[in-house]
């Protein structure tokens, strides 16, 4: 898997935990990483777990809020307290490269994305990642690499807030292939994108996908 060591100019350091609401985020971090350098953010202090639902409601009802920072001396404990307020689900996907160093992207819901999907009952999460890439792009015989990162994305379904944890793996593919986007999953295109051509694609994607590329350059 090619390293993304040349991408530093395009991305900023990721705080400890980001929970994405489409293109907005609640960020749980240490006090020194909080909103002081981010003019578009609001900083809120979590007194106890009972505050979490009201923070989520505030964020949902205020679309002009791009980011809420929750500073904490113990970000892991705070993150766990936030997670229990959601119905948690697991998913996995892959950052796939070929022998030329091109990356496999898909077009879904009008934005560029990486192939991913939900974990099935009893399935190892790395198996989920390979299966979903195969199903969504038609690429098989993938070589599984290291775990890159886990991203968090929340959404409301049937009146219930869900928090999706997505495990992202490096993958490689060495043979020619005819890409076959999974149209029943609203995927309209699958394409190999050269490293040099990535910036405009990454301007037309989700922040969580940018995070995957950011973390991959550190792998």
Please provide the spans of the model-predicted regions.
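Intrinsically disordered, low-complexity segments enriched in serine/proline and basic residues
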Residues: 1-7
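Unchanged
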Residues: 119-207
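Short, hydrophobic/proline-enriched secondary-structure or compact coil segments at domain edges
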Residues: 14-23
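Conserved Nudix-box catalytic region and its N-terminal flanking loop in Nudix hydrolases
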Residues: 35-46, 97-134, 139
């Amino acid at each position: 898997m090619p390293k993304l060591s040349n991408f530093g100019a395009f991305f900023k350091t990721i705080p400890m935990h980001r929970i994405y609401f489409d293109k907005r985020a609640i960020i749980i971090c240490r006090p020194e990483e909080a909103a002081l350098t981010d003019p578009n953010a609001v900083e809120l202090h979590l007194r106890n777990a009972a505050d979490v639902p009201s923070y989520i409601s505030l964020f949902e009802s205020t679309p002009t809020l791009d980011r809420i920072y929750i500073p904490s001396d113990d970000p892991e404990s705070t993150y766990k307290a936030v997670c229990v307020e959601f119905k948690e689900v697991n998913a996995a996907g892959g950052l796939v490269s070929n022998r030329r160093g091109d990356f496999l992207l898909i077009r879904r819901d009008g934005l560029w994305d990486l192939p991913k999907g939900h974990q099935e009952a009893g399935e190892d999460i790395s198996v989920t990642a390979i299966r979903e890439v195969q199903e969504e792009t038609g690429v098989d015989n993938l070589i599984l690499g290291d775990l890159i990162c886990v991203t968090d994305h929340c959404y409301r379904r049937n009146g219930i807030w869900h928090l999706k944890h997505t495990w992202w793996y490096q993958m490689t593919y060495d043979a020619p292939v005819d890409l076959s986007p999974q149209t029943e999953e609203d995927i309209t295109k699958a394409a190999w994108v050269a490293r040099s051509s990535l910036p405009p694609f990454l301007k037309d994607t989700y922040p969580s996908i940018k995070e995957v590329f950011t973390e991959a350059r550190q792998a």
